Amino acid sequence: MDKEIIIGTRGSKLALIYAQKVKDQLIKLANISDEQIKLKKIVTKGDQVQDKRLSEIGGKGLFSKNIEIELLEGNIDVAVHALKDMPANETENLSTYAYLKRNDPREVLITKNNKKISELNSNAIIGTSSYRREFQIKKIRNDLESKLIRGNVDTRIRKLDEGQYDAIMLSYAGLDALSFNSRISQTFSVSEILPSAGQGIIALQCRSDDQEIKTTLNKINDHHTKLRALTERNVLKVLDGDCETAVGVHSVIEEDKITLEAELFSLDGTQRFYEKKSSNILNCEKLGIEVGKILKEKSKDSYKKK
């Protein structure tokens, strides 16, 4: 490819690290020069409003919609997203086409005194921005309190250090990218806390009819990560939830077998519905649909507002 490629990204430190990673992969694997690739910072609504739950300011797509608009208007060629921030259903005329190799999807706890969750005082306040994490914490210790926290990673850590919270929950992948690993007090296994669907995956989106860009992106796509992403997100598509839907999803591929597990909480967090199934990787997308349907049936739509 000889033409210039413009990559659209959020302007946070973490998002720019992810975008630079994409650029580095294109240079290394797609034989594109450094001079050909430009990064364009785009402000999203999720970045602008930092004091409310995402569900209160518009729900799905708050971190991706403005970037997608730039893509549709032809101002950028590739959009870089954290997959977990994207709506389950694809935007018309766009294609989430390639995925970088998945980083560690696990959840971590950061505390001021390096305490584990079992060592926190009763009624300790844990900062989280998602109902999923809030309900999962209650599953481990129902005497802990959850309180909304928003902002980028360094802002959240600063709020913890200032004493606004006793602990905060974050994804390992983000902390690792920002070299904050030393702050981690506890890393939860996937069996302890199921992550968000697609957590730890950088997704690359382009216009559906841009065959030249698709050919280029295919050179940096990680096949197994793509299969896991499609499988996990099919669970979300079937559930058709929103930002308040508390659902954890994770998959693992071993040789030609993919194993998918998912949990769904009722709207108030008092009920938990769980399913785990395996299939041949050739049927991975069907597996996601099947698990989604089972959870939907088990829950009787108790995860949705009436």
Question: Predicted segment positions?
Answer:
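Short, structured active-site "lid" loops
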Residues: 51-77
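Short beta-strand and adjacent tight-turn residues that come in two discontinuous sequence segments
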Residues: 63, 81, 169-170
